């Protein structure tokens, strides 16, 4: 910009690029943002920071609707925080009733997975502590991706316990082999 006395050269900060914690967003020769899939940890920060909605996550709503219409065993899962998103009258029980009314086979509170994860991970961490090893949590898939892609030397420190969502999904599939979560 200093090379041009008329300030005709502008470099605008793009929220998506500057929100990316691993610098996975660059620009091509036409100035179009490009996400480097080999660096991206799939945290979603770019999606939430883009004021134009230019970056989006894949929606499976049509797939879910089609599966419900076909009578497949579709299970809904939600984190306990959703209970507070829609007012005092909404509870996990009302969520469950609503999902079943929409055609879902059943509804599970992912808080159950948090309890399962805490139980398994505490055992794993106790063993690591006895062995003098360090451990970090594996509950956040984006964090696990970041460690594997950008800090591979620390990959052995990541707990092998699955996320709460995955734990509940596995529980459902153990109970119903035809389940889709």
Regions found by a protein language model. Name each.
Residues 57-181:
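Iron-sulfur-associated redox domains of electron-transfer enzymes in respiratory
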Residues 1-41, 45-61:
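Iron-sulfur cluster-binding cysteine motifs and their immediate structural context
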């Amino acid at each position: 910009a200093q090379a041009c006395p008329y300030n005709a050269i502008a470099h605008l900060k793009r929220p998506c690029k500057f929100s990316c914690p691993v610098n996975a967003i660059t620009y091509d020769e036409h100035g179009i943002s490009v996400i480097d899939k080999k660096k991206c940890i799939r945290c979603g920060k770019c999606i939430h920071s883009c004021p134009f909605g230019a970056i989006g996550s894949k929606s499976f709503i049509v797939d879910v609707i089609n599966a419900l219409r076909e009578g497949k065993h579709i299970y809904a899962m939600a984190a306990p925080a959703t209970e507070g998103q829609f007012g005092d009258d909404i509870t996990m029980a009302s969520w469950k009733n609503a999902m079943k009314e929409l055609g879902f086979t059943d509804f599970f509170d992912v808080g159950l997975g948090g309890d399962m994860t805490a139980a398994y991970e505490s055992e794993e961490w106790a063993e690591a502590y006895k062995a003098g090893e360090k451990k970090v949590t594996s509950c956040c898939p984006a964090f696990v991706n970041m460690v594997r892609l950008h800090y591979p030397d620390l990959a052995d420190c990541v707990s092998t316990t699955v996320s709460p969502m995955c734990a509940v999904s596995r529980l459902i599939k153990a109970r119903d082999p035809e389940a889709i979560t």
